[in-house]
Amino acid sequence: MTQLQQPIKFAYWVPNVSGGLVVSNIEQRTDWSYDYNVRLAQAAEKNGFEYALTQIRFTAGYGAENQHESVSFSHALLAKTEKLKVIAAILPGPWKPALAAKQLATIDYLTEGRIAINVVSGWFRGEFDAIGEEWPEHDQRYVRSEEFIRTLKGIWTTDNYSFDGKYYQFQNYTLKPKPLQKPHIEVFQGGSSRAARDMASRVSDWYFTNGNTVEEIQKQVEDIRTKAKANNHQVKIGVNAFIIARDTEEEAKAVLQEIIDKANTEAVNAFGDATREAGAASPEQQGNWAKSSFEDLVQYNDGFKTNLIGTPQQIAERIVALKNVGVDLILSGFLHFIEEVEYFGEKVLPLVRQLELQQEKEVEIQAKSA
């Protein structure tokens, strides 16, 4: 089955940190508590979401004063769901691959193969300094992350595993039991730099990119897939999007404007300063948010840029347009998570599936007439 024949998948950001997904003083009927997140996870899997992504934060800032740890929180959500796969974010440095491999293999065993990992290379030096962790320069963080991923996959698939890298070494190590998922637990990563894209094209199963226009996303997809093909590797693409689905376009745009009008200016500017400092440390001297305006930065991962804001029909058409340029998954954020996840499942997702089916039939007709 080709990429275009595969139904596009949906994930959501788990609000396991306080403050929601917008740096705004607007009312958010979203809660970082465990009870709320259990209800959200159960609603999400009933409404067509296949993945959930927990966040990893060690320090407060930009509205996130409280943060639950990602791996244990992921496991807790898996215990209360039946189908949802939860992606636990992990930072090389605080986590060592031997511990992560065993921890995740155990969770995989306990949850019948529903854990995944998002390897976060890190962009905020202040957080690493606060917890006493080494802060390698930009490209070296990706060298470390690539070794981390290679060793995880090696441990999960090989007995008597040995590895001699710059950051990690193993000698004849055998992990038992190994994960239930075959060939191994899925590995996600993000980042927009050359080093991030190159790493994705060599070792990751999934690559998350910040929100952007269809045209810009297409450029990234083509770049990564071209590199991956040269490496005899396959990687899937997920795109961040903050979804505002309402009965009318005017309602949706009014919500967006209210979010921006009520932005926490001090926190947004501080986030912008931190991202520019981080970007300047990369070889390209720009990072994920180099072209992001103040309005874009109100949503951490440029989710407004993806423009899934409007009526269910408008959003469904834009999702299929993203699929047509090679996107495999939409990583979604919402203002009021539970009620909007339910609205999405009821109003938007059926339209997406109808458009996919219609497009597939058109392709079949064209193929027969060719």
Task: List each language-model region with its residue ranges.
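An alpha-helical appendage that flanks or caps ligand/catalytic pockets
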Residues: T2-N16, I131, H138-Q181, N212-N324, ...
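Acidic (Asp/Glu)-rich catalytic clusters
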Residues: T2-Q5, Q42-K46, H75-E82, L104, ...
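Hydrophobic faces of well-ordered beta-strands that scaffold small-molecule active sites
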Residues: I8-Y12, A52-T54, K85-A88, I115-V119, ...
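Glycine-rich, proline-tolerant flexible connector loops at the mouths of alpha/beta enzymes
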Residues: Y51-V71, G211-V214, S332-G345
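Conserved, mostly hydrophobic/aromatic
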Residues: F10, A44, G48, L77, ...
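Alpha-helix-loop-beta-strand connector modules within alpha/beta enzyme cores
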Residues: A64-A88, R144-F148, N231, E342-E360
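N-terminal beta1-alpha1-beta2 module of alpha/beta enzyme domains
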Residues: M1-K80, D164, K178-I185, K368
